[in-house]
Amino acid sequence: MMAAVKSTEAHPSSNKDPTQGQKSALQGNSPDSEASRQRFRQFCYQEVTGPHEAFSKLWELCCQWLRPKTHSKEEILELLVLEQFLTILPEEIQTWVREQHPENGEEAVALVEDVQRAPGQQVLDSEKDLKVLMKEMAPLGATRESLRSQWKQEVQPEEPTFKGSQSSHQRPGEQSEAWLAPQAPRNLPQNTGLHDQETGAVVWTAGSQGPAMRDNRAVSLCQQEWMCPGPAQRALYRGATQRKDSHVSLATGVPWGYEETKTLLAILSSSQFYGKLQTCQQNSQIYRAMAEGLWEQGFLRTPEQCRTKFKSLQLSYRKVRRGRVPEPCIFYEEMNALSGSWASAPPMASDAVPGQEGSDIEAGELNHQNGEPTEVEDGTVDGADRDEKDFRNPGQEVRKLDLPVLFPNRLGFEFKNEIKKENLKWDDSEEVEINKALQRKSRGVYWHSELQKGLESEPTSRRQCRNSPGESEEKTPSQEKMSHQSFCARDKACTHILCGKNCSQSVHSPHKPALKLEKVSQCPECGKTFSRSSYLVRHQRIHTGEKPHKCSECGKGFSERSNLTAHLRTHTGERPYQCGQCGKSFNQSSSLIVHQRTHTGEKPYQCIVCGKRFNNSSQFSAHRRIHTGESPYKCAVCGKIFNNSSHFSAHRKTHTGEKPYRCSHCERGFTKNSALTRHQTVHMKAVLSSQEGRDAL
C-alpha cells in the first residue's frame, strides 16, 4: 500500500502546471497535497511498534497534509470539507473531479456542475477549454475579459464593476466598450424565466427569482448571458456569475465597520441621495446606487442592507439631537452636516426622484410643509425604524399617563384621553412622552397615532384632506373643499397642517372651541421643556442634587419616591418579582426583565461601531464610552475616573469602608456581590466534603 503511495508521490511534478505556483496558497487537492492526504488516511497501526510512535507518526503526517504553520483555520477547514465532499461524490464523477485537482471547495462544486450540465460531453482540460471558449467569444469585448478573470481567479472573487458608474467619467469622444457588444434579441421576455431548450438551464430575467440580483442588474446579466454564442458558453458564463454573486452574499449579517459607515456617509454627502431619500425612503434605485458605490470601494453590501443602515443612522441622530440619549452618536457630526445641507437646498419635486412613482412612501427624518423642511414627531417612525432597537427597552415596566390627544371625527377634532406608556427606568420617564408631543409646539395640535399611520401610508404627492378613512381619493372640487373645511379645527384663519391651504374664519363651525395647549415650563439649566411645573421641579433635582426622600433605616437619600420604594426592599428582603423559568426573585421589575433575557438570549442593544450586542442598557452605555473615550465618573477623594457607574460605586466603598454584602455563614462583609459569591463557594465546598465523609462511614 505504501509502495503505491510512494509511486504516486514519485512523479508529482511531471504533470504539474507551471502556473500552479502563482495561484492561491491553499492548493487544496494538488498532487503533493493529495499524496500527503493519502499517506495520512492509509497509515496502519501495524507499521509502527507502539501506540506512542503511532500517534506521533499520525501527527507528523497530518501536519504534512494540512500544514498548520502556513494555513489558517479557514484553509484547514476548507481542506477537510473538500476531502469529505469528494468522498461522497458518485464514483463516475469523483474519479474525474480528482484528476482535475480542484484547489478548493468552490472549484470542486463548479467542476461537478459542469459535468451535470453536459452529461454526455467529454470535459476537456481547463486551459484548453479556456482557449476554445475565448476564441469563440472574441467579439464580446468586456464580457470576454470578465470570463477570463472569473476563470483564472475563482478562489479570489474580483471586485464588482459597474459600467453605469464608469461611463459617467468617460470623455465625450469615447464610447464604452460595453456598447460594442451585440445586442440581445428584442423579443427577449422580461417577466418570466426563459428556458434554454438545448441545455435544460433556466435563464433568469428581471421578473423571476434567480441567483442574480433583481431588477436592472438581473436584466443586464440576462442580456450578457444571451449574447453568448452557444449553450455551453451560456452555461459557463452563468456558473461564473453565480460564483461571483455567492461572494456578495457573504457580507449578509456582518456588522458594519467604522470605515464602511464613513464610506456610506461620504457617498451620501457627495451626491443628491440624501435629499431624495427624504422624499422617498423606499426608493430601491437609490439604495442600489449606494450599494454600487460601496462595492466600488471594496465593501460588499446589498441595497436592503444600505437601507437598514441609513435608517439606523437617522434614528440615532434624531435621538441625540432631541436629548433622548445622554451620549453623542459617533457619526452625529456627519449626519448633522447632511441634514443641514439638505435643509438649505431648494425643495425637490416628487418627479425628480427616479422610480418614485408607484413606490411606498415612508415618513422620514424630515417632511415638507409649504416648501420648508420641518421636523416630524417621534410617533412617525416607520416600521423599519421600530425594528432598530431603542436605547431604552420598551418591554420594561411602564406607568400609565392620561394625555389629552386630538382624535378626528366627522365634524372635525375632539380631545380625549389616551393611555400612554413609558419606561420607569429613566428619571424623566413621565415627561419624555409628553415632551415628544410638545417640543415642536409650533405645530399647535397633538396628532393621534392612528391618524399618523393613515397619513404615512399615502404618498406625499397624493396626500389629501379626508373626511373619513373609507372615503375615495377622487373628489370633485366642492367635495374636496368641504372635506378640507371639516379637517380644520380652529375658529380663526389658519394654515392647514397637512396641505398648507389657507382657511378663512367662515368655514369653521362656530361651536368648535379653539385648541389650546398647556403652558410649557422650561429648565433654565439645560433648556428641556415640560408640560407641568411638577415635572420641572422633579427634573431640577438632577442639577441641584436635592434628595428629599430619605431612607429611615440607613439615611440614604433619593430624588424619586419610586427609587426609595425599591431601596426599602433591600432592608426588608422583599423580592416580589419572580422569574417563571428558574424561580429567581428580584426586588425591581427592571432587574427581572434584564434577567429574563438570559433565558431568551435577547440582546436588544447593539453598538453601531463594532456590532457587539448587550442585554441591558447600562452595559451598553459603558461599552459605548470605550469608543468615545468618555469617563464621566470621577472619584472626589483620589481623582480616579471611571466609565462605568457600577465600577465607580464599588470604588467609592473602598474609601468609605462600606461592606453591604455579608456572608450568612460567617458574617464577613464584602464591597462587591461578586466577591461574596466567590467567598460562599468556600463554605459550599466544606459542606460537600463533610457530606462525602459521612457517606463514606
Curated annotation (Swiss-Prot):
GO terms for biological process: regulation of transcription by RNA polymerase II. PROSITE patterns: SCAN_BOX, ZINC_FINGER_C2H2_1, ZINC_FINGER_C2H2_2. Residues 37-119 form the SCAN box domain. Residues 1-33, 144-177, 347-395, 451-482 are annotated as: Disordered. Pfam families: Myb_DNA-bind_4, SCAN, zf-C2H2. It comes from the Eukaryota. Residues 10-33 have a biased composition (Polar residues). Residues 212-296 form the KRAB domain. GO terms for cellular component: nucleus. Keywords: DNA-binding, Isopeptide bond, Metal-binding, Nucleus, Repeat, Transcription, Transcription regulation, Ubl conjugation, Zinc, Zinc-finger. There is a cross-link at residues 152, 163, 400, 685 (Glycyl lysine isopeptide (Lys-Gly) (interchain with G-Cter in SUMO2)). A zinc finger (C2H2-type) spans 521-543, 549-571, 577-599, 605-627, 633-655, 661-683. It is found in: Nucleus. GO terms for molecular function: DNA-binding transcription factor activity, RNA polymerase II-specific; identical protein binding; RNA polymerase II cis-regulatory region sequence-specific DNA binding; zinc ion binding. Its main location: nucleus. Residues 383-395, 451-461, 472-482 have a biased composition (Basic and acidic residues). Belongs to the krueppel C2H2-type zinc-finger protein family. May be involved in transcriptional regulation. This is Zinc finger and SCAN domain-containing protein 32.
